[in-house]
C-alpha cells in the first residue's frame, strides 16, 4: 500500500477514499530514508498525523529494511493533559480506520490519575480506560508486559521523562528499571509543543546524547516539534550541535502552493482592545461587576452559528462569568472548561464543548468560557475570541485557537475577531 492510500484510509476509514490527501512534507516524513531532529511547521497542517501515521506506515507497510530501522515504540511526549487526551483519541480513531487490533498496535496513556492499562473504544462513551488484571492480560495488558509489540505511548513529560531517567513518577520503584530500559531502547521519541516544556527539552536532548554515546538496543531517535524552538536548546554536553546543524524538516514549496496551506498561513485574526478592562480595583472588589460588563460585551460580539471562545486567567472569574452568561438567557449554548472538574465530568464537557461539527451554522452558536486549560494544541477554531492578558507565550497559544482553520471571512463565513 502506498502512503497516499494508507493516509486516506486512516483519516476516513474507507479504502480508496478521494479525500484527505497528505501534504508533501507528510509523505516525505513517511517515505524518506531517515527522520529529522526538528519538525518545524505551522499550526494546523497536521503535525500529529504526520508523525503518528508516518511512523506507523514505516512499521507496517514499508520495505523490510525500513521496518527494521524504525523503532518499535512511538513515545509521544506532551506538556499538558488536554493534549494527551486529544492525541490519544486521534490515534484510536486512526487505528480503528486502518483495521488494526490492540495486539497489532497498542495505544497506551501515561498520565497522572490514569489507569496503566490499555485504551479502547466504547460505542457510546468514546475512548475509555480498560482496567487490567492478570486475567485480561491477553486482551491488551500493560504496555510493558509485551515489549515485542508495536505500541504508541502517549503521556505528559513528567511521567515519560522521569521513567527515562529511572525515577518513574506514580509507579513502584521496583519497576523503574523496566520502564527505564524500554523507554531508552527501540523507541522513537516525539516531543510536541516544546515551547511549553521548559527544561524538559534540554533533558530530552541530553538523554538522546547519552543514548548515542553509550549505545542502545535497536534504533532510538528523538524528534522535536515546534515552530519556535531554538537550536541552542538542543545543544547539551553529550548532545552537541553537528557542524552541519540539526536536520530539520519544514513545509516545502509544494506544501506552500497548496490552497489549504495558503488559507492557513494567510488566516486573518484582527486584534482589538475590549471595552471591559480588568484592573487592580475590579479584580476583587468589583469582580461581579467585571463579570457583568464582560458578559454584555461577549453577548454583543458573538455571531450566531459560530464559536466564541473566552479565555480568562482564573477559575473563579471563569465561574462568575459563566453564571452571568446563564442569567443573560442567551440562545447560544454555553460551556465552562477548567481544571477543577472531576476527570469524568471534564472529559464529557470538553468533548461536547469542542465538537465544532455539532454547531449548526443556522443556529445560535456556542460560547465556551475556559481557563489556560485550553491554551495549547487544542484543535478548536473560534470565530470570536476574548482573552485576558497573560505571558506572551500564553497569548500566542491562545491566539492559535482563533480562526485555526483559516475559513473565517471566506465563503460567507463571519470574519474572525480577537478582543483583549
What residue spans do the PLM features occupy?
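N-terminal helicase ATP-binding lobe
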Residues: 1-420
Amino acid at each position: 500500500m502506498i502512503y497516499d492510500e494508507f493516509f486516506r484510509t486512516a483519516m476516513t476509514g474507507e479504502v480508496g477514499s478521494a479525500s484527505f490527501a497528505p501534504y508533501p512534507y507528510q509523505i516525505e516524513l513517511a517515505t524518506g530514508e531517515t527522520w529529522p531532529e526538528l519538525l518545524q511547521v505551522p499550526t494546523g497542517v497536521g503535525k500529529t498525523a504526520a508523525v503518528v501515521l508516518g511512523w506507523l506506515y514505516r512499521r507496517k507497510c514499508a520495505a523490510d529494511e525500513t521496518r527494521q530501522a524504525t523503532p518499535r515504540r512511538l513515545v509521544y511526549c506532551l506538556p499538558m493533559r488536554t493534549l494527551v487526551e486529544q492525541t490519544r483519541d486521534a490515534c484510536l480513531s486512526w487505528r480503528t480506520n486502518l483495521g488494526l487490533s490492540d495486539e497489532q498496535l497498542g495505544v497506551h496513556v501515561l498520565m497522572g490519575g490514569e489507569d496503566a492499562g490499555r485504551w479502547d473504544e466504547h460505542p457510546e462513551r468514546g475512548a475509555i480506560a480498560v482496567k487490567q488484571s492478570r486475567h485480561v492480560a491477553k486482551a491488551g495488558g500493560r504496555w510493558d508486559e509485551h515489549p515485542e509489540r508495536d505500541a504508541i505511548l502517549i503521556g505528559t513529560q513528567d511521567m515519560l521523562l522521569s521513567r527515562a531517567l529511572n525515577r518513574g513518577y506514580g509507579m513502584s520503584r521496583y519497576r523503574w528499571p523496566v520502564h527505564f530500559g524500554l523507554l531508552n531502547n527501540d523507541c522513537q521519541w516525539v516531543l510536541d509543543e516544546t515551547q511549553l516544556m521548559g527544561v524538559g527539552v534540554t533533558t530530552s536532548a541530553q538523554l538522546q546524547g547519552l543514548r548515542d554515546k553509550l549505545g542502545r538496543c535497536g534504533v532510538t531517535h528523538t524528534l522535536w516539534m515546534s515552530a519556535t524552538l531554538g537550536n541552542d536548546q538542543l545543544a547539551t554536553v553529550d548532545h552537541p550541535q553537528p557542524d552541519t546543524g540539526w536536520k530539520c524538516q519544514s513545509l516545502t514549496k509544494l506544501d506552500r502552493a497548496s490552497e489549504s496551506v495558503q488559507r492557513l498561513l494567510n488566516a486573518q485574526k484582527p486584534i482589538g482592545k475590549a471595552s471591559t478592562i480588568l484592573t487592580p480595583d475590579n479584580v476583587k472588589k468589583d469582580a461581579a461587576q467585571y463579570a457583568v460588563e464582560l458578559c454584555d460585551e461577549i453577548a454583543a460580539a458573538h455571531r450566531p452559528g459560530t464559536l466564541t471562545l473566552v479565555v480568562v486567567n482564573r477559575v473563579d472569574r471563569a465561574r462568575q462569568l459563566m453564571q452571568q452568561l446563564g442569567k443573560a438567557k442567551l440562545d447560544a449554548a454555553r460551556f465552562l472548561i477548567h481544571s477543577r472538574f472531576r476527570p469524568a465530568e471534564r472529559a464529557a464537557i470538553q468533548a461536547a464543548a469542542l465538537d465544532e461539527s455539532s454547531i449548526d451554522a443556522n443556529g445560535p452558536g456556542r460560547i465556551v468560557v475556559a481557563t489556560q486549560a485550553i491554551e495549547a494544541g487544542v484543535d478548536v477554531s473560534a470565530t470570536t475570541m476574548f482573552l485576558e492578558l497573560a505571558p506572551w507565550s500564553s497569548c500566542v497559544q491562545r491566539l492559535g485557537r482563533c480562526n485555526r482553520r483559516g475559513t473565517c471571512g471566506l465563503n460567507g463565513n463571519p470574519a474572525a475577531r480577537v478582543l483583549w
